Structures are given as structure tokens and as C-alpha cells.
Amino acid sequence: MGPETLHIGGRKSKLAVIQSNHVLKLIEEKYPDYDCKVFTLQTLGDQIQFKPLYSFGGKALWTKELEDHLYHDDPSKKLDLIVHSLKDMPTLLPEGFELGGITKRVDPTDCLVMPFYSAYKSLDDLPDGGIVGTSSVRRSAQLKRKYPHLKFESVRGNIQTRLQKLDDPKSPYQCIILASAGLMRMGLENRITQRFHSDTMYHAVGQGALGIEIRKGDTKMMKILDEICDLNATICCLSERALMRTLEGGCSVPIGVESKYNEETKKLLLKAIVVDVEGTEAVEDEIEMLIENVKEDSMACGKILAERMIADGAKKILDEINLDRIK
């Protein structure tokens, strides 16, 4: 008998393929007897390139088509696991699916990218009315608080497409905002003009980490994933996802986070913000908690902070955003 094959699913974009192959290598390094193959698929989020993400909620934009293949009738098309950018993965998965593991986190920050020919080095340099390209309402809402004189316009497409739009001499954008991790994974770290930290902008829940989705209760896959996943990223991201789930936010709403786990003290510091779309109202808070049971305590940390923020008005902000989306 030959080696057992594992089918790994992911999106078709260049970044998604790099991420799927990264997980393939992690598995094959620990389990050389497995023959891993990557299967790619276009998702609804890939197909709808002309509308801002904010306008249609986006809770399963990047996942559903791939999930169908975890239970596919045809063995040649059936997947064993799916690799997602964790920030695109809904915090509540459909019945029959679960988050099997989280890989080591790459830089979770957002970053500013200027065109090759630009003399500007930061948002502070931009003139009044300068146009910032971003499809993320989380990014634009937070930046509007600090830079009310700038304009924010949607820019869709994969990383290469967005960079081409930015570098075009006729581009309407003075700059664009991207996730630092995506550029780093693609070998484009040289395009990062400036990284943002929480004094300017909190990053997305799960940003910089990969989430691996499996069939619920698949003990064989769980055993494999236990060997390739990262404790620090798991603690931070489980707390961030619990916060988002308690706030009932999808990946297209203005919830920003920053988390840090200290492996010596076993304490997790979680900071979060909820902002209205125009950047005029915000609820910001933080919590530090001792993590003794990885799953239970990490999730409790996020839930407690979210409940405090709801009491301070965060839910009201998010409910108004959802009402605007329905109109």
C-alpha cells in the first residue's frame, strides 16, 4: 500500500494557495507518511468583486463552497481539512463543522501601502481629501476617528490586483490599507510603508493566523492538527473569536482587537474596540486574565470583555450598523 492521501482545501487566490501549501508542509514535516494534496475552489467572496464587503454582511463569504466538499459524496473530491485566513472564518460554524486548529501567527497588524512613486510615508503626510483605499469598514471607521480630513473608498480584489490599482499612475488612491501578514506571506514585505498599532488601529479578529476547519468530531484530523498548531496563537485567537461571537459581529463589522499572551506568567491581555461606521462613536476596553485551561479560559476572557463592552454601548453601535445594511 502507498502512503495515505490527505486532501487540503483552500481558495484559488495566490495568497490562499501559499497558505494551503504552508499547512501541507507543516503536516508532511510531522507526518512524512502522508501524501498531502491541495484542492482549490472559488468562493462567493471571490466571485462578488464589485460590491463593498460591508454591504452584504459576509459571515460565510469565503467558506461555504469549501465546506460542502468536507462531506462530498465523491471520494476524489472529498476534503479532509480546509485552510482559511482565520479572520475570514465565521465565529459560529454550521452544524457538522469545527475549528480543528490555529497555526502560528504571522504579524497581525494592518499596514499602510503607498504607491511606488509616492513621496508620502504616513497618513499624517496626506493632504486634505486624500483618498485611502480599503474595503474594510473596521479599518476605515477607526482611521476616520484620527484622520477625519481623509476620504475612504472601497478597493476590492486580491493583493496583486489592489497593488496594481494603487500603482496605476491614474489611480484615485493615495494609498491602500492591507493586512501585513498577507504581504509577508507573498514575499511583498518591501511594500509595507508603515505598520499600524492599537494607538491608531486595532487589527481584525484572528488576523495573521490560519484556521483549519474539519468535520466535527474527526479525531484523526484533530490528532494531526495538535502537532502543527501553536499555543500562543490559539489562546489569543480563541479569546478574540469569543469576543466577536458574544458581540455577534461578522468579519465585515468594525470590531478591532489586540491580544498578547505571556507564556511565563500565563496571563492574556486582550484589548478591543467597537466603532460606528463614521468613526464618531467608539467603545474601547481591555482585560487581563490568567489562562489555566487553554480553551475554556481563553474563550471566557473574550466573553467577559465583550459583555462589559455591551454594557458600555457596543451592541447599540453594531445593531445600528446592521440596520443600515438592511435598508
Curated annotation (Swiss-Prot):
GO molecular-function terms, A-Z: hydroxymethylbilane synthase activity
SUPFAM superfamilies according to UniProt: Periplasmic binding protein-like II, Porphobilinogen deaminase (hydroxymethylbilane synthase), C-terminal domain
Known cofactor(s): dipyrromethane
Superkingdom field: Eukaryota
GO biological process, one term: heme biosynthetic process
Cofactor note text: Binds 1 dipyrromethane group covalently.
S-(dipyrrolylmethanemethyl)cysteine modifications at: C251
A GO cellular component entry from the record: nucleus
Pathway: Porphyrin-containing compound metabolism; protoporphyrin-IX biosynthesis; coproporphyrinogen-III from 5-aminolevulinate: step 2/4
Pfam annotation, one family: Porphobil_deam
Assigned protein family: Belongs to the HMBS family.
Function: Catalyzes the tetrapolymerization of the monopyrrole porphobilinogen (PBG) into the hydroxymethylbilane pre-uroporphyrinogen in several discrete steps.
Database matches in PANTHER family: PORPHOBILINOGEN DEAMINASE
Anything else known: The porphobilinogen subunits are added to the dipyrromethane group. Present with 8480 molecules/cell in log phase SD medium.
Protein name (Swiss-Prot/TrEMBL): Porphobilinogen deaminase
Record organism: Saccharomyces cerevisiae (strain ATCC 204508 / S288c) (Baker's yeast)
